[in-house]
Design a protein with these regions (language model features):
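Acidic, serine/threonine-rich low-complexity disordered tracts
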Residues: 1-127, 167-262
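Hydrophobic, well-structured mid-protein blocks that either form specific transmembrane helices
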Residues: 121-164
Length: 262
């Protein structure tokens, strides 16, 4: 029997397969530890972070980029310190995560992190052996469970999980999301606090407040995240309190609504 010829792909279908992104920028007020997120482009997912101090002087900037083609993704960030902050953080911070996205969300395959003049950290996720290889001298292998995230994907994975299973995100619910740490798997403890009304430069949003801590480690950073259902559970606020870093607080707040949403 003869087969029906395949329908030629339309231009719009080809475009849909290409890397998509929306451009965002963040600004952090170090006094209030507040940052802002604003959309700049429909063609690529990019977040730009600027840290300012009194009187609103830029001391650092960072850019986050997200690309997706088919089921493969790339998420990267570059942060560069300047001014006062450069005294404490020399050089740049570069992070790159690559992998696939499936029904469970982000599945990292490679992650790298370079901080200033320090040696680059590189992680490879072997989906067959279920081990992560942290490259170095010596290299270290450790097992990882399903759903493990890296330091870039974890916040966005949280939003995807909330969209997929709202029952896990009712106030009072608690859960663990495994995170690839240095030489081991960390298990941050997530607690759903409550729905709160968040006021941002992008408008007001109902947002789900989630607190994140690492049990048994008083020096580990604490995170608070607010996810907005109106924005498909993307964060409208992320606040980090670093106990081990002298009590520093970084608070990021949405500045402009993104035009492209994961």
């Amino acid at each position: 029997t003869s087969r029906t010829p395949a329908r030629p792909r339309s231009r719009s279908e080809d475009c849909a397969e290409r890397a998509c992104s929306a451009r965002f920028a963040l600004v952090v007020d170090a006094a209030r530890a507040t940052s802002w997120l604003r959309c700049e482009s429909k063609t690529s997912d990019t977040w730009n972070l600027a840290v300012v101090d009194r009187p609103v002087v830029a001391v650092a900037s960072a850019t986050y980029r997200f690309q997706k083609q088919g089921n493969r993704y790339r998420l990267d960030t570059e942060a560069r310190a300047s001014g006062v902050l450069a005294v404490f953080y020399s050089g740049t911070l570069v992070q790159v995560s690559e992998g696939v996205m499936d029904a469970q969300g982000f599945v990292p395959a490679r992650y790298s992190e370079k901080r200033g003049r320090r040696p680059e950290r590189r992680y490879r996720f072997d989906s067959l052996s279920r081990h992560i290889r942290q490259e170095g001298d010596p290299a270290i292998d450790f097992a990882y469970p399903d759903g493990t995230q890296d330091r870039l994907t974890i916040f966005f994975q949280l939003g995807l999980l909330a969209r997929a299973d709202a029952r896990r995100f009712r106030p009072g619910q608690k859960f663990v999301l495994p995170l690839a740490g240095s030489r081991r798997i960390d298990e941050p403890f997530f607690r759903v606090v409550r729905q709160e009304r968040m006021r941002t430069n992008a408008g007001e949003f109902d947002a789900l407040h989630i607190s994140v801590e690492k049990p048994g480690d008083q020096d580990a950073p604490r995170f608070d995240i607010w996810l907005a259902p109106e924005l498909k559970m993307l964060p409208v606020r992320i606040r980090v309190f670093d106990h081990g870093g002298g009590g520093k607080i970084v608070d990021q707040v949405l500045r402009r609504r993104p035009q492209e949403i994961l």
